[in-house]
């Protein structure tokens, strides 16, 4: 048990942990149901707070669009990469809560659990049938090859006169 109680509830925020940043809910402690509360919008609840904070870089090279997501502590089996309607890349995953044993005494809980999901609309030149994904050291890399840009055939016209 911590010597200093946490009066604010929940886990402490850590800017380096994408699963620890909580979304503030101004209606959370109201004693009555509210249509704007997280109960009405579960996708914005504390359990899904990592949705907001998962960091993703997107760069475009001459050959491909490359997405890199920081997802430390997850195995590749806990991450999904999907293409929806041939135009939306979706990266999602979930870190589950560690099983509790009744004989265990927890002194500190800083590693958090939760879900994340990020969606990106792909440009027209994306070859969605050739997408590849890999994961190494907590970084997911998704590579979406691009269609080759056809250079227009230019024909010079001689000007008479």
Curated annotation (Swiss-Prot):
Record carries keyword Cytoplasm: yes
A GO MF label: unfolded protein binding
GO BP, sorted A to Z: protein complex oligomerization; protein folding; response to heat; response to hydrogen peroxide; response to salt stress
Alphabetical keyword list: Cytoplasm, Stress response
Subcellular location: Cytoplasm
Family per similarity comment: Belongs to the small heat shock protein (HSP20) family.
Protein name (database record): 18.5 kDa class I heat shock protein
Native source organism of the sequence: Glycine max
Source organism phylogeny: Eukaryota, Viridiplantae, Streptophyta, Embryophyta, Tracheophyta
């Amino acid at each position: 048990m911590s010597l200093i109680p946490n009066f604010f509830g929940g886990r402490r925020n850590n800017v380096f942990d994408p699963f620890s940043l909580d979304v503030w809910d101004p209606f959370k402690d109201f004693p009555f149901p509210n249509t704007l509360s997280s109960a009405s919008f579960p996708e914005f609840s504390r359990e899904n707070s990592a949705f907001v904070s998962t960091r993703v870089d997107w760069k475009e090279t001459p050959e491909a669009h490359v997405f890199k997501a920081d997802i430390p502590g997850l195995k590749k089996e806990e991450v999904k990469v999907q293409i929806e309607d041939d135009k939306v890349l979706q990266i999602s995953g979930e870190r589950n809560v560690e099983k509790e044993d009744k004989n265990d005494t927890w002194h500190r809980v800083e590693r958090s659990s939760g879900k994340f999901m990020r969606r990106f609309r792909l440009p027209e030149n994306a070859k969605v049938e050739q997408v590849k994904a890999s994961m190494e050291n907590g970084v997911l890399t998704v590579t979406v090859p691009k269609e080759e840009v056809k250079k227009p055939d230019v024909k010079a016209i001689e000007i008479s006169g």
